[in-house]
């Protein structure tokens, strides 16, 4: 998972590689408004590790994106992705674009992403 953080007049902005764009969108919309939520997320990451090899999962439901954690994988998904969508209504040759709506990564990669965000935020904000 590749990512980059920049600082603008609006604060810290995250950008992620193509397959992980939803993580950046989640961070930019859900966490920048409530950075203290990271404390709860890190606590749940530790619970995931402590539960291994047993199954443990946790969900953080946000306004636009939800975060799903388990022992092996992290998923970020746009809340509107579950809305009913009729593909038969689309014109021929078109596909529904959801690259920025859902993404997956490993628990360790996700934790490193959040720690890098915290470090960047403390240094440049």
UniProtKB/Swiss-Prot annotation:
Belongs to the UPF0231 family. InterPro entries: UPF0231. This is UPF0231 protein APJL_0987. Disulfide bonds: none annotated. It holds the Pfam family UPF0231. It comes from Actinobacillus pleuropneumoniae serotype 3 (strain JL03).
